[in-house]
């Protein structure tokens, strides 16, 4: 029986799962509270931990990409979520995509079996007392009662935007006489299903999107409805201009069906090249289920079925999940948090994940790792830590705790995904982009290793595919 105080983690999403694991692995007991299935959120379907409600992709794998560097840092820090994602990966070209069902089930099983983690299934309606070390990892779908209590505690109204999830269809219902398998620019294996459109099909599809009936927003949301630019509903993209979708998720560049002829023949290429292409990505290794890439939507389910069947190759599509839209809540973190992810006004309360204003699955995991590590250190009477801003984890946590950080044109704090623009400039200017990103990576991993040595953190690189 541990003599250390028990840490409370509220929320068993990506950030909360990571935080709970890091705390327990440090030898500190944890109470992990998850309200599902006692109370479901508007977007979740199961009671499993770390359920992925939007895409099944964690983004780029290559460490010379910002999202890939973030994952590599987390592997070296012993992240359970990234380890599990690697173990449940499905083919996705240069991205880390997972079988979302087996991924969540595996995490739930491992966390539930840990001797220092106690699972509690109920809604946490308020913040615990001041003596309790707590990690708040309730995510963008924080329950209203807790959100109201948080507003009272911070003295601020929370920020929000609207997020949406893409539909999923059965692979057997895709017409392979019209669709073809390929990865963009032939990178990796042919891991994506591609549905090409000519100009007439594209314009008719866009017109159908513009005229389709949307699901009704709650009255209090209608006037303040705004979207995160990195995850716009497909109908919102259609509204922004005739070619917006073609330069976004439906871009045809780098995709070629061998049945069209010789790609190297200029005349064939000009006459056969698709005007737009809808891509689908595997949900599972066998390809039984596929999600429509970039097709977040708030259309009514009946309208999704009608409009999306206009896509060539999907005229007989069988839907296993329709797209949904939900309100995402996040804190005005730069006014509330320290770079350690502790609240400025209460040092034993920490926040992690998308509620802090980071964007993306891997960034949520990174916040969970840091908040969990610091909660464990508080329980052990040690100083809390930060990671250097030259690392991607450090850059993200400094971003959400910097009162001078980037704001939109209205002066409002907005979520930010991992990107190299967050990192300090290199000592020497490198003009070639690939070499520059490689230099950012090399510096980040060197600084991470130095930080691990400074703070006595064990080096824990994780082999991809290990369990």
Curated annotation (Swiss-Prot):
Its main location: cytoplasm. Keywords: Cytoplasm, FAD, Flavoprotein, Methyltransferase, NAD, NADP, Transferase, tRNA processing. InterPro entries: FAD/NAD-bd_sf (IPR036188), MnmG-rel (IPR002218), MnmG_N (IPR040131), TrmFO (IPR004417). It is an enzyme of class 2 (transferase). It is found in: Cytoplasm. Its cofactor is FAD. One of its GO terms (cellular component) is cytosol. It comes from the Bacteria. FAD binds at residues 11-16. Gene3D superfamilies: FAD/NAD(P)-binding domain (3.50.50.60). It catalyses: uridine(54) in tRNA + (6R)-5,10-methylene-5,6,7,8-tetrahydrofolate + NADH + H(+) = 5-methyluridine(54) in tRNA + (6S)-5,6,7,8-tetrahydrofolate + NAD(+); uridine(54) in tRNA + (6R)-5,10-methylene-5,6,7,8-tetrahydrofolate + NADPH + H(+) = 5-methyluridine(54) in tRNA + (6S)-5,6,7,8-tetrahydrofolate + NADP(+). One of its GO terms (molecular function) is flavin adenine dinucleotide binding. GO terms for biological process: tRNA methylation; tRNA wobble uridine modification. Its EC number is 2.1.1.74. HAMAP family: TrmFO. Belongs to the MnmG family. TrmFO subfamily. Catalyzes the folate-dependent formation of 5-methyl-uridine at position 54 (M-5-U54) in all tRNAs. This is Methylenetetrahydrofolate--tRNA-(uracil-5-)-methyltransferase TrmFO. It comes from Prochlorococcus marinus (strain MIT 9303).
